[in-house]
């Protein structure tokens, strides 16, 4: 039964990670990120107790909430995502398919290296890392770059949970996750402030 839930979580990760590549609305981005952390919880439960695994999803949801609240407080006209987000959905789907093929080929070897972490855990973590790196490669939006970094970190956390069960490490990774969200929120606000100041300087 646990293995079945793990593979369901892998499918959810595949859907959410591809969805993050395709959606343009920041609201859907935050929702998909939150669902992704829920699937991450299921995979981490394969190796960690519920208490420690819950720390991951709570930190992830808090990070998503930080980004969502920051973005909702900024004027929409400051973020022309159509101009900075590639329009080729077919290209992004093709790139995601290549990542999927690489993950399927690398999963058996990586699972063996990582103390037999399990195919579901390994494939889910590699999917997140691969899709996160792909996300970073096709966008310059601060919000999406932050989401890409958080996705890569989530994949690393899943894989690392198979070989390390330290409470201190779990807390440290949760702090890093929150730090990424706070840094992304600060940069969003700072970039918006600089865009507001620039027209005033030109008018002078």
What are these model-derived regions, one by one?
Residues 1-204:
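Alpha-helical transmembrane segments of multi-pass membrane proteins predominantly involved
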């Amino acid at each position: 039964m646990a293995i079945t839930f793990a593979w369901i979580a892998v499918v959810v990760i595949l859907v959410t990670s591809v969805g993050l590549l395709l959606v343009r609305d920041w609201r859907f981005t935050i929702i998909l990120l939150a669902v992704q952390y829920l699937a991450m919880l299921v995979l981490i439960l394969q190796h960690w107790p519920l208490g420690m695994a819950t720390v991951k999803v709570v930190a992830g949801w808090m990070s998503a909430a930080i980004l969502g609240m920051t973005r909702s407080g900024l004027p929409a006209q400051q973020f022309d995502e159509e101009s900075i987000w590639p329009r080729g959905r077919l290209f992004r789907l093709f790139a995601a398919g290549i990542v999927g093929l690489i993950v399927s080929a690398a999963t058996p070897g990586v699972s063996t290296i990582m103390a037999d972490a399990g195919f579901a855990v390994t494939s889910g973590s590699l999917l997140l890392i691969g899709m996160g790196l792909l996300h970073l490669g096709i966008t310059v939006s601060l919000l999406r770059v932050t989401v890409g970094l958080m996705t890569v970190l989530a994949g690393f956390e899943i894989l690392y949970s198979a070989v390390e069960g330290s409470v201190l490490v779990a807390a440290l990774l949760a702090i890093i996750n929150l730090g990424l969200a706070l840094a992304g929120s600060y940069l969003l606000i700072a970039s918006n402030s600089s865009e507001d100041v620039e027209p005033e300087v030109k008018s002078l």
